[in-house]
């Protein structure tokens, strides 16, 4: 399975902005990145799984929208997040 409850909780703990944070853009992007990474590995062995590929493209688009929102709202938080997740070179 891609995202166990334990893994999800660890990601939330790492990227939360306050104690009861589960929905901030940072947390959402971290969770999406984890799912995207899992699906990318899945496609290395299942090249013809086009239904899941469409889901991957939707996840990438959603992550892109969240990152754009964060960049427009607070550039420093955006830069910190992409550095922590290793999204840009």
From Swiss-Prot:
PROSITE patterns xrefs: RIBOSOMAL_S15 (PS00362)
Function: One of the primary rRNA binding proteins, it binds directly to 16S rRNA where it helps nucleate assembly of the platform of the 30S subunit by binding and bridging several RNA helices of the 16S rRNA. Forms an intersubunit bridge (bridge B4) with the 23S rRNA of the 50S subunit in the ribosome.
Keywords linked to the UniProt accession: Ribonucleoprotein, Ribosomal protein, RNA-binding, rRNA-binding
A Gene Ontology biological process term: translation
Lineage: Bacteria, Pseudomonadati, Thermodesulfobacteriota, Desulfobacteria, Desulfobacterales
Recorded GO CC terms: cytosolic small ribosomal subunit
Molecular-function GO terms, alphabetical: rRNA binding; structural constituent of ribosome
Family: Belongs to the universal ribosomal protein uS15 family.
Stored PANTHER family: RIBOSOMAL PROTEIN S15, BACTERIAL AND ORGANELLAR (PTHR23321), SMALL RIBOSOMAL SUBUNIT PROTEIN US15M (PTHR23321:SF26)
A Pfam family hit: Ribosomal_S15
Signal peptide coordinates: none
Protein name: Small ribosomal subunit protein uS15
Coiled-coil ranges per UniProt: none
Subunit composition and interactions: Part of the 30S ribosomal subunit. Forms a bridge to the 50S subunit in the 70S ribosome, contacting the 23S rRNA.
């Amino acid at each position: 399975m891609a995202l166990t409850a334990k893994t999800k909780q660890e990601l939330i703990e790492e990227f939360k902005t306050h104690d009861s944070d589960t929905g901030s853009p940072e947390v959402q992007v971290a969770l999406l990145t984890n799912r995207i990474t899992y699906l990318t590995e899945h496609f290395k062995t299942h090249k013809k799984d086009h239904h899941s590929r469409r889901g991957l493209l939707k996840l990438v688009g959603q992550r892109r929208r969240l990152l754009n929102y964060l960049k427009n709202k607070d550039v420093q938080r955006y830069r910190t997040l992409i550095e922590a997740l290793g999204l840009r070179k």
